[in-house]
């Protein structure tokens, strides 16, 4: 299994816009891709705003390519996301998952920020 990691930053006032876009537009799209096994969106407040980390899980690099295309190390950042982020990684990092466990979550563990 492959874990794909991408980082970005947003202002406190725009972080919710990115979270909303990721959870209502991007994640539903990637869930339909063969070989996608899950995703996590992490958020932490930092001195100059909010750091966001997206972790996606894939069966293989072939599955990653179904999402990212022929340049799987290049980040896929939609224009709507670019508009609300102050910075983001142009390239992602891939890890081979060697062990792991996550309890099943039957519903979202968070509430989307109000617009």
Where do the PLM segments sit?
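Short, surface-exposed ligand-recognition loops at beta-strand->loop->(often short) alpha-helix junctions
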Residues: 9-22
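Short, flexible segments with low predicted structural confidence
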Residues: 1-2, 18, 36-39
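An amphipathic, aromatic/His-enriched active-site/gating alpha helix that lines ligand/cofactor pockets
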Residues: 24-36, 57-94
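Short, well-ordered beta-strand segments in beta-rich or mixed alpha/beta enzyme
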Residues: 2-9, 40-71
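Short acidic, gly/pro-rich beta-turn/loop elements at beta-sheet edges
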Residues: 16-18, 49, 64-66, 102-104
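Glycine-rich beta-strand-turn "strand-cap" elements at beta-sheet edges
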Residues: 40-50, 76-115
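Non-catalytic surface loops within mature trypsin-like serine protease
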Residues: 10-12, 60, 96-99
């Amino acid at each position: 299994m492959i874990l794909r990691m991408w980082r970005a930053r947003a202002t406190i006032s725009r972080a919710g816009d990115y979270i909303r876009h990721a959870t209502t537009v991007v994640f539903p799209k990637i869930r339909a891709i063969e070989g996608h096994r899950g995703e996590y969106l992490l958020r932490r407040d930092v001195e100059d705003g909010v750091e966001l980390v997206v972790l996606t899980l894939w069966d293989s690099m072939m599955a990653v390519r179904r999402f990212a295309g022929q340049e799987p190390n290049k980040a896929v950042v939609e224009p709507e996301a670019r508009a609300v982020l102050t910075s983001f990684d142009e390239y992602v990092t891939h890890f081979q998952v060697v062990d792991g466990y996550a309890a099943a979550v039957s519903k979202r563990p968070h509430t989307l920020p109000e617009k």
